[in-house]
Amino acid sequence: LLIEQENCLGGMWTSGLLSPLFDAHNKTGIMKELVDDLTAKNAWGGFWQISYIQEYMKHFLEEKALSAGVTLLYETKYAGVQVKDGTVEGVFVRNVEGETYYKGTIIIDATGDAHLASDAGAQWVMGDENGNCQSMTLMFLVGGIPEKYKDGFVMYQVLEEAYAKGIRHFTLEVR
């Protein structure tokens, strides 16, 4: 059973539009399979040749989970954990049907912010040794891009030149 708070798998990869997969070409296993599948569907590449189309990623992840026999429970939020004698026995979840309890032998916290682990009493740390966390990333989709910029190479060169000059704010005039 996989409990997902969104209406698709992938978390920030899909719902958060966080599409760059840095160093993906040097990976094997499921990551290579993922890149190969997205490439075959013309859904891989983008700005730095490390991005993908989120809708295809959603499909890939769901297909993999279902083919492995995973039951998916979408739009369901973690609501609490049942711990007995230091062992997590199950989780409470909440969705439009109300609150439900699921007992399990192996429970993995994939909340992204360790809610389940924290509620179960696990020790955790946040940030680096000084408590600093990675800054937020703003991701967005842009349409109507002129053809010459679609492969990303020309735009990449413009950005590289701007950074080399130390320019952080610039305007790109599209003609």
Which functions belong to the PLM regions below?
Residues 1:
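Conserved beta-strand positions in the Rossmann-like core of class I SAM-dependent methyltransferases
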Residues 89, 110-111, 115:
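Glycine-rich phosphate-binding loop of nucleotide-binding enzymes
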Residues 86, 111, 133-137:
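Short, solvent-exposed loop/turn segments at the edges of secondary structure
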Residues 85-91:
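Short, hydrophobic/aromatic-rich segments at coil-to-beta transitions
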Residues 4-84, 134-135:
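Conserved N-terminal/central alpha/beta ligand/cofactor-binding core
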Residues 116-175:
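Rossmann-like dinucleotide-binding core of oxidoreductases
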Residues 95-106, 110:
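Core beta-strand elements of the Rossmann-like FAD/NAD(P) dinucleotide-binding domain
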